[in-house]
Regions:
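Short hydrophobic beta-strand element within catalytic cores of glycosyltransferases
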Residues: 292-295, 305
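A short, well-ordered alpha-helix in the C-terminal region of glycosyltransferases
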Residues: 321, 328-356, 360
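Nucleotide-activated donor-binding/catalytic signature segment of Leloir-type glycosyltransferases, i.e.
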Residues: 228, 237-257
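Conserved donor-binding/catalytic core segment of Leloir-type glycosyltransferases
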Residues: 160, 173-227
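N-terminal strand-loop element at the rim of the active site
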Residues: 13, 39-88
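Acidic donor-binding loop of glycosyltransferase active sites
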Residues: 264-278, 291
Length: 363
């Protein structure tokens, strides 16, 4: 079996791991895939700014300073730098490293490139038709992205979706496969028993459904723990903060390596999402710990949760029906939740799928 030489990248503007308090799932996935392929004997170069720390054979920074470090912050916080300019700077930092990847690939140093911000790499991939480029799509495919992907389409560019639902806005892209995000099962150990609280974990934003989770807790008189990076603004001030009390508690940001303690003892994790989420790691993390999920029927939810076996899917997205599901959550066998993740959403299964797809197309 050929051992491929691979270059991969997520972002050039901040380091891997991300800054403290930052949740950025694509980075976790990229690191897991890279480290897993190295363990299988592949050569993987991970591109990122100085300070990037990943257990791969080589980190390539090409002298680039991270924008979340003092030297980089001086650029983004300089005179006449507004939000639009900051985004341009981010893009150029990414493109600097992407250009380096293509230069090395042209020299024959890589068999393929695996890039996680596809829109920033498209022009270079389009102009280098002999270099195989794989993109993992982490975000929804918005109409403007569909247009751009079409503009720069070429046979050497392959898209990896993280759910079948993610493909719906752009079914005709050159998809290599759907590969579900995997999690480290050792980091999310199983608990057969639970305490008496519901759980919400994620960004504290409207699309994640925090306000709906709060209302479910009030409707059912259940205790709710809320975990996520602190936010400010009208949404928090009007829809969340007024309801915080001894039963509805905001815990704050919890590092990913400590989340299992909260998942394990929850009676259920609430996921009343308000958007077509391509893949929800909260779903798999919760079930790995044995905790069933109660979720609205949006995005990838029906691909991840088995309705009636590993949780409940609220098909018409009604709060009352979610509240009713809370009352029957003990019908779910927690061991079934764990088994489902072991069989379908482990890191090892994800790594094996990437290896399979890369070898099938490039070899």
């Amino acid at each position: 079996m050929k051992k491929l030489k691979i270059a991969t990248m997520v972002t050039g503007h901040f380091t891997t791991p991300p800054p403290k308090g930052t949740i950025y799932a694509p980075m976790d996935i990229a690191v897991a895939v890279s480290e897993g392929l190295v363990k299988k004997g592949y050569k993987v170069d991970f591109y990122g700014p100085e300070g990037t720390n990943v257990k791969v054979t080589n980190i390539v920074s090409a002298g680039l300073k991270a924008l979340n470090q003092p030297e980089g912050e001086a650029i983004t916080k300089g005179q006449n730098v507004g939000n639009a300019e900051v985004n341009k700077i981010f893009n150029l930092w990414d493109q600097y490293l992407i250009a380096k990847m293509f230069t090395e690939a042209e020299k024959g140093n890589y068999d393929l490139l695996h890039i996680h911000p596809p829109d920033r790499a498209l022009p270079l991939a389009f102009s280098h038709p002999k270099i195989p480029v794989f993109y993992t799509l982490h975000d929804p495919i918005y109409p403007w992205k569909t247009k751009i992907f079409s503009m720069f389409a070429s046979p050497n560019q392959y898209y990896i979706s993280i759910s079948d639902a993610q493909r719906k806005p752009a079914p005709d892209l050159n998809y290599a496969a759907t590969i579900y995000n995997g999690i480290d099962l050792d980091a999310f150990p199983f608990s057969e028993s639970h305490d008496d609280y519901l759980l919400f974990i994620g960004r504290l934003q409207p699309e994640k459904g925090l306000a709906e989770a709060v209302q479910i807790a009030r409707m059912t008189s259940e205790k709710l723990l809320i975990i996520g990076p602190q936010v400010t603004g009208e949404y928090w001030d009007k829809k969340i903060a007024p309801y915080l009390n001894d039963k509805i508690r905001y815990i704050g940001f919890v590092p990913r390596e400590k989340l299992f303690k909260y998942y394990q003892k929850a009676k259920a994790t609430l996921v009343p999402i308000q958007w077509e989420e391509p893949f929800g790691l909260v779903l798999t993390e919760s079930m790995a710990c044995g905790t069933p999920v109660i979720a609205f029927n949006r995005g990838s939810v029906p691909e991840i949760v088995i309705d009636g076996k590993t949780g409940f899917i609220i098909k018409d997205n009604k709060l009352k029906k979610m509240a009713d599901a809370v009352k029957k959550i003990d019908e779910i066998n927690r061991a079934d939740c764990r088994k489902h993740v072991e069989q379908n959403f482990s890191i090892q299964r994800m790594i094996d799928r990437y290896e399979e797809v890369f070898l099938k197309i490039v070899s």
